[in-house]
Amino acid sequence: MFMILIINNHGQYNHRIHRTLRYLQIPSELVPNTTPLDEIISRDPEGLILGGGPSLERSGNCVEYIQKLEIPILGICLGHQLIAKAYGGEVATAEAESYAQIELEILDEDDIFRGLGPRMSVWASHKDEVKKLPDEFDVLATSSICEVEAMKHHDKPVYGIQFHPEVHHTREGHRVFENFYDVCRS
C-alpha cells in the first residue's frame, strides 16, 4: 500500500502535517524520530517527510534516514536543516528570528513548487537557518529574511523548505504536499 511516513521531530506543527495529508487523502503515518532505520525500511514507504522541531539535538535518527534511504524526502524547517547538515551544509542561528508571514520568491518552479511561482505568501517560524548550501543542492526559493528558503538535491528527489506549508497562514501550502506526493508517485 502506498504510504508516506512523517517523522515527528517534536515540533508544534508535526500533527498538522499529518492532518493536512489526511485531508488531501494522501496515505500517511506519523512516526517518532527514534524509529529504527530497519523498521522504516520494513514499512516500505514511497516518501518521507521530516517535520519541524525545537533543536538539532532532538532529531533522533533523521540524519541516518537522510543518508541511507533511497526514496523522496521533504524536510520542513528542522527537517530542511537536517538535510543540509547531512549533505555537508551549515546551519546556524538566523540573523533575526522569524515568526511571521513572509513573501517567498520562487526561483525554480520545478517539482514541489510546480504552479506556485513566482511569489508565495508563507509562514516562517524558526531561529536557525541554512547558512551554507550543500554542494549537491540548488536554491529553489529565497526571501528577505532567509537566503535558502527551499533547496533541492541535483540528482535525487530530496527537498528542504524552511517555511511551514502545513499551517493555514501559508496560502497554497497544501499544493506543496500535493506536488511532493506527485514526486513520490513518479
UniProtKB/Swiss-Prot annotation:
This is GMP synthase [glutamine-hydrolyzing] subunit A. One of its GO terms (cellular component) is cytosol. Pathway: Purine metabolism; GMP biosynthesis; GMP from XMP (L-Gln route): step 1/1. It is an enzyme of class 6 (ligase). SUPFAM superfamilies: Class I glutamine amidotransferase-like. It comes from Methanothermobacter thermautotrophicus (strain ATCC 29096 / DSM 1053 / JCM 10044 / NBRC 100330 / Delta H). InterPro entries: Class_I_gatase-like, GATASE, GMP_synth_GATase, GMP_synthase_A. Catalyzes the synthesis of GMP from XMP. GO terms for molecular function: ATP binding; GMP synthase activity. Its EC number is 6.3.5.2. The lineage of its organism: Archaea, Methanobacteriati, Methanobacteriota, Methanomada group, Methanobacteria. PROSITE patterns: GATASE_TYPE_1. Residues 3-186 form the Glutamine amidotransferase type-1 domain.
